[in-house]
Design a protein with these regions (language model features):
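Outer-membrane beta-barrel "beta-signal"
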Residues: 226, 255, 261-262, 266-269, ...
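Detector for outer-membrane/organellar transmembrane beta-barrel domains
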Residues: 125-239
Length: 293
């Protein structure tokens, strides 16, 4: 809407779609959210709307201009197909999902095309003794060589990620538990077989272009939160890159001032050496007041 040296104003249409239902079939056309992932930080099976845990101010979550057809084969099972063009990159994402429940777990199997390359995988969500247990696994066709990154990497005697000549394998494992006193703990790990362990920040743009959730080989997420009072919740999470030893820590406090009015205080603390994944962003402190109506 506007932008100057001190302020930025913007507007976003998050959802605008037509929804049609006929017996066990549901057809949705327009801007919608297609959330196939089961993990809460990294979603390798979420082909249409992957999340960014650091985008804390986008609570509505991103949508996609897509066609979605769902056929419900039972109370907790379905077959789904979705198609979404990317007008900016002249690419198409299309995929099918089969979802069913067994042994008190929900299982999803996917197969499709993303970034003009085939991708397949599966995910699950359930619990072990009251603790949430989730995971996602994907295998994707190796990317084309992105030679436009050669000049940048040659200064550091490095090669683009896309030159690895390997199919992409991604694995996410997640667990969480809430104690009776409201104390919450959540741990999640991500593995990318072609991710980097050094100079990770240099590979961020290329990693995003070829579909990696992170340019690093390993990533570890840890979160703790607790209700200080009925109106106040404190939380802190961190992401650590074991390869380059960089990290980000994000403490926050959410306070309900009055009905429908919330005060949110958050800080993003990045640390690491130059060219590490989280080493070049410094520290930010943010206050947000939100009124809901």
């Amino acid at each position: 809407m506007w932008q100057n040296q001190n302020t930025v104003g913007y507007a976003e249409v998050d959802r605008l779609y037509i929804d049609y239902n006929a017996n066990d079939v549901q057809v949705t056309v327009g801007r919608q959210r297609i959330a196939w992932g089961t993990s809460w930080v990294w979603n390798s099976t979420d082909l249409f709307n992957p999340l960014s845990i650091l985008d804390f101010d986008y609570e509505e979550l991103p949508g996609n201009d897509a066609l979605r057809v769902q056929y419900y084969t039972g109370a907790v099972s379905k077959i789904e197909f979705a198609l979404a063009p990317d007008r900016k990159k002249n690419k198409l994402t299309s995929a099918a999902l089969i979802s069913y429940n067994a042994f008190d777990y929900d299982f999803n199997f996917i197969a499709g095309i993303k970034n003009n390359r085939w991708i397949t995988g599966f995910s699950w969500v359930g619990d072990i003794q009251g603790a949430g247990f989730r995971g996602e696994v994907t295998i994707q066709e190796k990317p084309e060589r992105l030679s436009e990154y050669e000049l940048l990497y040659s200064q550091f005697e490095l090669q683009p990620i896309s030159y690895s000549n390997k199919n992409l394998f991604s694995f996410v494992l997640s667990g969480d538990y809430t104690f009776p006193n409201s104390f919450y703990i959540h741990t999640e790990v991500l593995y990318n077989n072609i991710g980097k362990e050094e100079n990770t920040a240099l590979f961020s743009l290329e990693a995003k272009e070829i579909g990696l959730l992170s340019p690093s080989r390993f990533s570890v997420y840890q979160e703790f939160s607790y209700n200080i009072s009925p109106l106040t919740r404190a939380s802190a999470f961190g992401i650590y890159n074991p390869g380059d030893k960089s990290f980000v820590i994000v403490p926050s406090i959410n306070y309900s001032v009055i009905t429908n009015l919330d005060l949110y205080l958050i800080s993003l603390i990045f640390d690491g050496k130059k060219f590490t994944q989280y080493g070049d962003y410094g520290t930010s402190f943010i206050a947000r007041i939100k009124y809901s109506f």
